[in-house]
Amino acid sequence: MQHVETHPRRVRGEAVHMTASEKRASEISHNSAMGLNEPKIQVRIKSPANMDCSYEIISEESRHRAIEEAFLTPESKHFISTPEVVEMESRLALWLEAGYPVHLIGPTGCGKTSLAVHVAKELGRPVVWINGDEAISTSDLIGGYSQMQNESVRDNYIHNVFKTKDTMKIEWVDNPLSLACKYGYTLIYNEFSRTKPASNNILLSVFEEGILELPTKFGEDRYIKVHPDFKAILTSNSIEYAGIHRPQDALLDRMVGIYADYYGYETEVRIVVEHTGITLDKAEKIVNVVRSIRDKLPDAQKPGTRACIMIAKGMTFLNDHQNIDFKQLCIDVIASKTSSPADMEEKKKLVLDLVD
């Protein structure tokens, strides 16, 4: 007689209980179906409606790439190095290495953002990006509870006992500041003075005590110890433009301030050539005109290096538009900061007097 081992309890030919191997296989199958095999990293930000800003990455190794893709840090293309640029780079790098956040102050169009991005990339750490805005709140900086996950478990381990369990979880989604503090990323907070001061209060304890508090969380999860590799570069305009808020003194006191003025003549010429590919003599002509206009206009209306680049790019298309000349290009670019028809006429006359 041959003995065949069977399950200890069978009802109508079928096993009542699962074996240990069957239970393990069932758990693996359930976890796979629920997507629980590996931790998920989720990144979410506010941005224009036409952009897809939600990313769900399965593997831990993809975290850095996902963060940089989600927060869309601009590339510092065509960055040029001259003695004055290198000096600014060195000053920023020194204070960042010393552990202080750097506040880069300067007029619009002088190259603050390009410098901040370049220095941040040179640090060799992932970079996250925030653009200051009137509508930015504390949650936009640190994150918040964004979605609910409903999980149901049905268990009939014993044939005549049916157990059910419903669990509802609210998931927390980190935003740039939380990510930078947790993992030691470099934070660039562009035009931070456009954000209401109350929203930036969260930065006080980050910069001073090295602690990020998440007000909407509870218990141990409420506090994050700032990673030792965390760095922060904040930029703001030195002129009182529309939409600018004066930052609180307590925050300014925790940062090192570096003033970035318009670059010198040689540097501006090199920047224009590098960005547009025009000849040196044309770049010199453009920079001379813009710098002369800059000297004659009030601070809030001064054209920056960006204006030089715009005129130069316009020049590359003049052959296709024979009825437009260099003077008109200059007038159109300078007119972007015009407040009235009389102001426009004054600037037009200024350009005509400067351009032969």
Regions from the PLM with identified roles:
Residues 269, 276-325:
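Conserved AAA+ ATPase small/helical "lid" subdomain
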Residues 3:
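Cationic, low-complexity basic patches in intrinsically disordered or flexible, solvent-exposed regions
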Residues 148, 315-318, 336:
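Phosphate/oxyanion-binding loops and surfaces in catalytic or ligand/nucleic-acid-binding neighborhoods
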Residues 68-71, 75-79, 324-356:
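C-terminal engagement/docking regions of AAA+ P-loop ATPases
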Residues 7-10, 14, 19-284, 288, ...:
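AAA+ P-loop NTPase catalytic core and its hallmark functional loops
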Residues 20, 83, 281, 306, ...:
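Alpha-helix boundary/N-cap detector
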